[in-house]
Curated annotation (Swiss-Prot):
Record's function text: Plays a role in type II pseudopili formation by proteolytically removing the leader sequence from substrate proteins and subsequently monomethylating the alpha-amino group of the newly exposed N-terminal phenylalanine. Substrates include proteins required for biogenesis of the type II general secretory apparatus.
Full protein name: Prepilin leader peptidase/N-methyltransferase
Binding site for Zn(2+): C36, C39, C61, C64
GO molecular function, one term: aspartic-type endopeptidase activity
GO biological process: establishment of competence for transformation; methylation; signal peptide processing; sporulation resulting in formation of a cellular spore
Catalytic reaction equation(s): Typically cleaves a -Gly-|-Phe- bond to release an N-terminal, basic peptide of 5-8 residues from type IV prepilin, and then N-methylates the new N-terminal amino group, the methyl donor being S-adenosyl-L-methionine
Gene that specifies this protein: comC
Entry's cofactor comment: Zinc is required for the N-terminal methylation of the mature pilin, but not for signal peptide cleavage.
Lineage of the species this protein comes from: Bacteria, Bacillati, Bacillota, Bacilli, Bacillales
Cofactors (names): Zn(2+)
Cellular component terms (Gene Ontology): plasma membrane
Entry's EC annotation: 3.4.23.43, 2.1.1.-
Amino acid sequence: MLSILFIFGLILGSFYYTAGCRIPLHLSIIAPRSSCPFCRRTLTPAELIPILSFLFQKGKCKSCGHRISFMYPAAELVTACLFAAAGIRFGISLELFPAVVFISLLIIVAVTDIHFMLIPNRILIFFLPFLAAARLISPLDSWYAGLLGAAAGFLFLAVIAAITHGGVGGGDIKLFAVIGFVLGVKMLAAAFFFSVLIGALYGAAAVLTGRLAKRQPLPFAPAIAAGSILAYLYGDSIISFYIKMALG
């Protein structure tokens, strides 16, 4: 099963990266077919094979020789690994469906935020019915836990945005509402903590290495995605570990 999830993740990861690059530009995610961003030549089926095509072509376009962004194979590999991690965590269970849908959403919004500093409403709206169906299939502790989580996620980020005078974007606020719906209040708090920690560490490293100016805006969705997935898959284990450490 893990190999199937991994391969499935490779294929969808390629599609998710393309979708994340096209949706903010109001382009179709289906047509035209993928092409080289430099010479605009339509890629052949062999050039669309996840990971392998990048390796065989040595990271370059066969036609014009320009280097292909490493983000393409990175998105494929990250999605594949996360799908497999969900399979390891939940096995063949009802919770595997919301896990795959949730990871898919977070991969796409991470891509849009990296490239455009934007989390389009249409992506969140598209995924809402699937996440709602997923929570009907595999509910949280109570039927209202998801609604409480959504309200908590929205209000908490909205308050932070008001205090920081726009330090948090509207897309981040709505994304956290969706995350709260999926995770519930308890894991939402863990997701927020992990997200802030990851974002702070990345931001500090980027400033120290000169990749980011001190006051330059930083896309927060990738950190939110990483922190939320960490909380979703391993939050209970991490919390239990620290409680045991605190109690000696």
